[in-house]
């Protein structure tokens, strides 16, 4: 019975994520419209609200192209696997009851994000197009560079809370958010999240001016739609993770979802206002700035834990000596 309830809960979570992805695309088009002093989609239904469903019908009913020189199987499997990973990683979202509560949620998240690199690489390689391959290679180099800092920051928090289980973030932030005490780290995490999800100013995988849309240039119809559904599901997940780690992990509170929406809005806002980085500056930022920053924080948290432990030991032994 418990397994059936968990299964129903997982299906509901996936359906809610997919619906959220649809409306996130609408929010993005509306926000970008107002940033560029225009209306955005407003013709379909009331204020353009049913627009995402019309887009989905249009994309999935268009003709599927078959590039003659592509590696057929990997070309079609990679968008499906990409979306599967983006939905699968939601399983580590912290719940109190009736859904999987991973004791190793942090580790599971790192594994899923590491696998996400391969889908972009295979999608670029299997298209047998030079532009797609270049886009794939740039995406792999970028993601590897940023995942090192991402993993180190995640490890810092694991040392701080003493568990891989995400639900511990809720217990540690009942009285004060980590955003207040670790503000520089939150800014770095947000920047790494932008790079991880291939968003502006780090969207080198799909630079239109340089790579003719990048690794997805040969995709059309359903394959193209699946790639972008995976991207927007990742944006929502990284927004959720930011709220869990820094803004109090109160998943049963309506305010949590308001915070999640705001962080998603920040992703879109960054796209509307910031220009694309230069590639060498991106690498400099990843290896010279963020890596040293995250290593320093990791060492600080380890040292902090050792200091606390030694202080407790000193109190314990001093009490023993006083008793004797």
Swiss-Prot record:
Q: Which GO terms describe its cellular component?
A: mitochondrial inner membrane; respiratory chain complex I
- Single GO molecular-function term? NADH dehydrogenase (ubiquinone) activity
Which keywords describe this protein according to UniProt?
Electron transport, Membrane, Mitochondrion, Mitochondrion inner membrane, NAD, Respiratory chain, Translocase, Transmembrane, Transmembrane helix, Transport, Ubiquinone
Q: What does the record say about its membrane topology?
A: Multi-pass membrane protein
Q: Where is the signal peptide?
A: none
Q: What is its EC number?
A: 7.1.1.2
Enumerate the transmembrane spans. Answer: 3-23, 77-97, 104-124, 150-170, 174-194, 226-246, 250-270, 297-317
Its EC top class is translocase
Q: What is the protein's known function?
A: Core subunit of the mitochondrial membrane respiratory chain NADH dehydrogenase (Complex I) that is believed to belong to the minimal assembly required for catalysis. Complex I functions in the transfer of electrons from NADH to the respiratory chain. The immediate electron acceptor for the enzyme is believed to be ubiquinone.
Q: What is this protein called?
A: NADH-ubiquinone oxidoreductase chain 1
Name of the gene encoding the protein in the UniProt record: mt:ND1
